[in-house]
Amino acid sequence: MPTLTGSKTARTVTLCVLYAAQGMPWGFVTIALLSYLASQGAGLAETAKISSLATLPWTFKVLWGPIIDRFTVRSMGRRRPWIIFSQLAMSATLLAMILIGDLTAEFETLAWMVFLHNCFVSLQDVSSDALAVDVLKDDERGTVNGMMWASSYVGTAIGGAGMGTVIANFGLRPAFCLQAGVLFLILCIPILIRERAGEKLLPWTEGEPKLEPGEEETEDIAGVVKGLYGAFAAWPPFLAALYAYAASLMIGMRVAVMPVFYTQEIGWSDEHYSQVEGGVGSAAGVVGALVGGFLADRLGVKVIVTFGMLGVSAFCVAMGVSEELRANESFQLIFLLGTTFLISLKTVASFALFMRLCTPAVAGTQYTLYMALANLARVSGAAIVASLESDGYRTIFLVMAAAIVFPLFFLYPIRQGQPEVKA
């Protein structure tokens, strides 16, 4: 049986399948489950509560990082034990939802079960990211990151559209069972494939811990914190942290402004906007992820990020200054798809950068902090849009155009001691 460090195919397939497994529960809860509950008479308060409790566990990612870096069954690999545990718990919590009596009436119980389920999904996410940092080689990070990101889109589509079809034809409980079964089948991959040759496949089998050159064991949580401080004391990782935050501000602004702008300002229906942004837009995101990952390995992270950011900025300037383009139906569609494609392109290239800058001993925590800063920036971006509401869309789009290129000031100095980050 191949190992993750010994086989590019094994690590690529494993990471992509794990990312699809993360996307499935998200699509299932936010699309299929909430749509079903709404059709059964659930009000906005009930569906909003479930949605909020599904999102909340993703803020715990910054806590999972130090835990998975510190505690593990090292003889089975550094990340596999956590992935196996979280994937198994994801399946178990879905099956537990079947035991809830009247699913449409017991919202409180269902909401907290959704919360618990997504706690394990977020843990699997952090563990998979840390595994990618550990096993991917420098010359494949961009391509594989693109494939992983695209796989998450596929998982979301399966969990949302696929499970939604199951619910419509067979009911909610069969959908719980089917999704739990799929997640359990995915569990077979991390169970059967070792990280490194010579490690234990399972706790009762033969094997021993294997450390890669430069990899260290962290003794305690204090050691993790110390290691993290040491990692960010270096100039490139610190600049990358500033870049991680700045690069996501505009994304948060876009998420906040697009639905209102398209439905209230230029007259799209809610249904049409949802179909374009959620359907064709998702496809554009998949293509952007695959292309961005492929080109980042060949042309360099900075080239791809710069192209993506300048492209988005140009779209925003055009939408802001030209009322004629703003009223043009073709440009309205091109703007949505083009910005989605370019944002996905630069995002995947950025993931490759963050992974290359991670220190092995605290890789899980360090990478998670980069992601946490990006998530925080999206909240900040939405707040910026709210503060600009009275200034009009021209100002908002011009601020978005500036916000998407500003991070380049943090990106370009990242070179000293990091020759793999190509200019």
Model-predicted segments: where are they?
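Helix-to-loop junctions at the C-terminal end of transmembrane segments
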Residues: F60-G77, I167, V287-V301, E389
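Intracellular juxtamembrane helix-capping segments at the cytosolic ends
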Residues: L33, S122-L136, S344-T359
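Symmetry-related core transmembrane helices of the 12-TM Major Facilitator Superfamily/SLC fold
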Residues: F85, S91, P174-L192, T395-P413
